[in-house]
Amino acid sequence: MAKLVQSDAEEDGGEIDSRRVHQRFNSDYLEVPNGWTLRSYDLHRGEEGVQAQISIGDERSPVTVLSGRGEGAVGALVEALNRRQGWQLQVEAFDEYSLGDNTEANAMACVRVQVGGHTQSAVALAADTTAAALQAILSAAGRMAEAQARKSA
């Protein structure tokens, strides 16, 4: 984020205000790419890990169901994305935070993923830590897919 803010400040020839920093954060980390919104998820833990069914999409795209298995919810989603996209996506950094002090607190997840030497980062806010983690991975994956599509065009 610091590099992005510094770049904006250099382009504008000076300092930028907190409103602009907030806008940059929203557009570069928090906004969900079209078609990559978490609609629902269903997780089942068994002897072989977590089996996940994750529905994604938005009002502009049909719902897609991703299925995967992993050690946890994030691992299952990564496995499903790798199969669907033909990637070897890896999670390089992952942090979760509670945004409050009680059981009604929202959650925030921050991720950085890598595919073929290229990285994307994303942040997600949700009512629970699992939804925040899944949405952050989906947002980063969506940004990766968009970057690959631009590169191939």
Stretches found by the model and what they are:
Residues M1-A153:
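Terminal or standalone catalytic/regulatory effector modules within metabolic enzymes
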